[in-house]
């Protein structure tokens, strides 16, 4: 450390004390401290400005300055300074960017965190938690850990007792920034399960999580007491710190609880710990099985004789026959059985073979019955087809005969009327087809509109429950699209209904016009028919008059003939006279 001292030179008669009336001068020292201790000490520089005393000769020497320079190195060894440990600070990460192994500013040890899931009760505080997630304000939510497994969750000044349980699966939590790539953030293997509201924090130790079990006690029920004692010992020495008063009070309850959750976080993983994951074999159990196998092998070696039989299918059938005959046989009293008794193993093998063969025979019989039923059905269908064919032939023959009769009875005269009827029927059928098409199109549009409205309501319901902003934006976009499609379908349906109404009105007008024309035609036809009837009546009257004239003439002729026959023979008339009389209608003399 360098020190500089500056002194003002005084005369020979001056004293060190200051004069009267003058202020006392302060001694000025300038010190410079070097904070960096790694710099080596530099040589000192000393300047003395005091005036020298007079020499013995009485001669006064000139004022001179004495300068001393110490350029020698400090011989003391420099002590080794211990450097402070370096703190490695991670760079500030831009929100939305995650770890990239191919980036230029790659991290040496990227951080992968572990997290827990908080599952709360579906009560009135659920909406408060959703609003906190949406707004990002978590001031009303706090978690206070009581020990490694118990915590007190406070939501909007309401305390809940919670227990940390182990999930049967490890869940990877991912996020997406561009809606295409997934980026892993952390793993989840535990869940903080809220049980019920509590009034005091001490109540959390008395809670038990539902659907939990202790896997160690479950698989080793014979040594439960020893397991519980070991757990209590572990809890007492947790982290080398003494237990709190509440933990010591509820030590046994904490140790006897189960913290292994049976289910996953989704419905398909219900009771997945027992349904899907089998327990692992303990090494002691493997040793026990090996010892038992060795014992059986030793007993097999120590046996005097070992025999085994290879059973063939034909032999099984023979044994089956013998078994069936043996069951049907009844032993008579006093007569010993000549057949030796079968062993249990043989009976078991024979019974299994009998069951298999019986099943095969039943299957064959079932196939035969099905084939017979198919044949019967085929024959029935053929008979029905033949009957229908015969009936069709008869109907066809009757129609042909009817056509011939129509031709013979003057069917040609009504050809024009038939053509008109056919044309009218064709027009009616075309109009009916158009009506059916319009009706089907209208029904199709109505069904599509109903489906869109149902989907729209379902999407709105999802939007009301969604908490993620990305999902909300997607639901909003889909709702806008569905509303546009529904509006378009409504317009199409309205246009279709209007067009159908116009067509119906046009058809009604056309039908009224056609009815008027038909009525006029019918009136004209009726007038023509009346004229024809009048002409026919006139002709009939003329014919009747002619017939009456002929009848009268014939009657007159008969009368004349009778009179001639009755007249006396003396007056004879020749043929010319008779003709003249007939011609002029003359009558004979009386």
Curated annotation (Swiss-Prot):
Residue ranges of the TM segments: none
Subunit structure: TAF7 interacts with BDF1. The 1.2 MDa TFIID complex is composed of TATA binding protein (TBP) and the 14 TBP-associated factors. One copy of each TAF1, TAF2, TAF3, TAF7, TAF8, TAF11, TAF13, two copies of each TAF4, TAF5, TAF6, TAF9, TAF10, TAF12, and three copies of TAF14.
Pfam families: TAFII55_N (PF04658)
InterPro entries registered for this protein in UniProt: TAF7, TAFII55_prot_cons_reg
Note: Present with 1100 molecules/cell in log phase SD medium.
Biological source species: Saccharomyces cerevisiae (strain ATCC 204508 / S288c)
UniProt keyword annotations, A-Z: Coiled coil, Nucleus, Phosphoprotein, Transcription, Transcription regulation
Residues with PTM Phosphotyrosine: 99
Positions of post-translational Phosphoserine modification: 101, 104
Protein name as catalogued: Transcription initiation factor TFIID subunit 7
GO MF: protein heterodimerization activity
Known function: Functions as a component of the DNA-binding general transcription factor complex TFIID. Binding of TFIID to a promoter (with or without TATA element) is the initial step in pre-initiation complex (PIC) formation. TFIID plays a key role in the regulation of gene expression by RNA polymerase II through different activities such as transcription activator interaction, core promoter recognition and selectivity, TFIIA and TFIIB interaction, chromatin modification (histone acetylation by TAF1), facilitation of DNA opening and initiation of transcription.
Region of interest (Disordered), residue spans: 1-65, 325-453, 489-579
GO CC annotations, alphabetized: nucleus; transcription factor TFIID complex
Family indicated by similarity: Belongs to the TAF7 family.
Coiled coil, from the record: 427-549
Skewed-composition ranges (Acidic residues): 360-388, 398-422, 516-548, 566-577
CDD domains named among the record's database cross-references: TAF7
Chain intervals with Basic residues compositional bias: 1-10, 42-53
Highest taxon, organism lineage: Eukaryota
Compartments where located: Nucleus
SMART domains: TAFII55_N
């Amino acid at each position: 450390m360098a020190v500089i001292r500056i002194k003002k030179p005084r005369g020979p008669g001056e004293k060190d004390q200051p004069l009267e009336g003058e202020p006392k001068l302060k001694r000025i020292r300038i010190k410079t401290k070097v904070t960096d201790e790694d710099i080596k000490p530099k040589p000192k520089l000393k300047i003395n400005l005091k005036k020298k005393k007079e020499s013995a000769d009485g001669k006064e020497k000139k004022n001179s300055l004495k300068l001393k320079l110490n350029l020698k190195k400090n011989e003391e060894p420099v002590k080794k300074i211990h450097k402070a440990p370096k703190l490695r600070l991670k760079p500030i990460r831009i929100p939305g960017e995650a770890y990239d192994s191919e980036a230029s500013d790659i991290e040496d040890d990227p951080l992968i965190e572990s997290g827990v899931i908080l599952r709360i009760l579906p009560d009135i505080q659920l909406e408060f938690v959703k609003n906190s997630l949406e707004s990002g304000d978590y001031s009303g939510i706090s978690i206070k850990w009581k020990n490694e497994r118990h915590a007190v969750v406070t939501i909007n000044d309401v305390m809940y007792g919670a227990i940390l349980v182990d999930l049967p699966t490890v869940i990877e939590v991912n996020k997406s920034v561009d809606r295409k790539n997934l980026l892993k953030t952390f793993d989840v293997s535990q869940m903080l399960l809220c049980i019920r509201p509590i009034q005091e924090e001490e109540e959390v130790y008395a809670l038990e999580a539902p659907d939990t079990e202790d896997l160690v006690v479950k698989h080793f029920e014979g040594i439960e007491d020893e397991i519980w004692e070991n757990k209590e010992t572990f809890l007492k020495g947790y982290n080398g710190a003494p237990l709190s008063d509440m933990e010591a009070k509820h030590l046994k309850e904490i140790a006897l609880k189960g913290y292994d959750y049976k289910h996953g976080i989704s419905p398909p993983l219900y009771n997945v710990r027992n349904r899907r994951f089998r327990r692992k074999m303990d090494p002691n159990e493997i040793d026990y099985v090996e010892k038992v196998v060795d014992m059986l092998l030793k007993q097999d070696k120590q046996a005097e004789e070992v025999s085994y039989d290879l059973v063939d299918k034909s032999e099984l059938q023979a044994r089956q026959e013998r078994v069936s005959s043996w069951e049907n046989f009844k032993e008579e009293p006093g007569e010993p059985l000549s057949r030796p008794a079968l062993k249990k193993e043989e009976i078991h093998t024979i019974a299994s073979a009998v069951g298999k063969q019986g099943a095969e025979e039943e299957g064959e019989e079932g196939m035969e019955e099905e084939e017979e039923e198919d044949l019967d059905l085929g024959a029935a269908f053929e008979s029905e087809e033949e009957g229908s064919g015969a009936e069709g032939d008869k109907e066809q023959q009757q129609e042909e005969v009817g056509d011939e009769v129509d031709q013979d009875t003057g069917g040609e005269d009504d050809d024009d009327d038939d053509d008109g009827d056919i044309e009218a029927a064709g027009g009616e059928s075309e109009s009916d087809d158009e009506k059916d098409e319009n009706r089907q199109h209208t029904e199709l549009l109505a069904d599509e509109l109903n489906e869109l409205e149902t989907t729209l309501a379902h999407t709105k319901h999802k939007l009301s429950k969604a908490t993620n902003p990305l999902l909300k934006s997607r639901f909003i976009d889909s709702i806008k699209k569905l509303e546009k499609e529904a509006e378009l379908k409504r317009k199409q349906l309205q246009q279709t209904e209007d067009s159908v109404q116009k067509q119906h009105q046009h058809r009604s007008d056309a039908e009224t016009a056609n009815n008027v024309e038909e009525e006029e035609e019918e009136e004209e036809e009726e007038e023509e028919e009346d004229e024809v009837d009048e002409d026919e009546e006139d002709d009939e009257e003329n014919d009747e008059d002619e017939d009456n004239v002929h009848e009268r003439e014939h009657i007159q002729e008969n009368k004349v003939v009778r009179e001639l026959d009755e007249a006396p023979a003396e007056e004879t008339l020749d043929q010319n006279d008779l003709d003249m009389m007939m011609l002029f209608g003359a009558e004979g003399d009386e």
